[in-house]
């Protein structure tokens, strides 16, 4: 199997690239994600796939996630980006009361399988409103999966799994990554998933 050494950002970029190429239903939306943008994991993708599939949005987290929920209900596979995790609370109603609960409120007849990707900047001197790790909030919400990869391999495989997750019981997924870390790892260049449904990857465990 062909392998390449990649950083987390490069691994996420490749996962998004391969997902966009594999399925026309996949599209990305978020603030400043189109070229030239501020998001390393989406670099080059709007140039390659066009602005219909890599959408720059206004600065409104509620609108980003709300649009993703509507698109998912219509059969698309949206990957929404919240640029900084601290602001994910602005989209809490769309995440919790719409995406996560829709399956239960419709007895399984309707789901909104979205992927929400965000970043953590804690420890990088980014200030009190750009450095929180809020993953635990959403672990208490039925219908959501929370993924925090620790390696580039986990990042690529778990993001792919989240986008194409076949288990619609968890209709809303968040994908949180510490993309600033400089860890490099040799990972498969081809598209792969980690678990069906999503597994725990290869995160180190301490007791």
Language-model features: where?
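Thiamine diphosphate
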Residues: 1-168, 172, 176
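Glycine-/acidic-rich phosphate or pyrophosphate-binding loops and their flanking alpha/beta elements
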Residues: 11-18, 156-167, 179-207
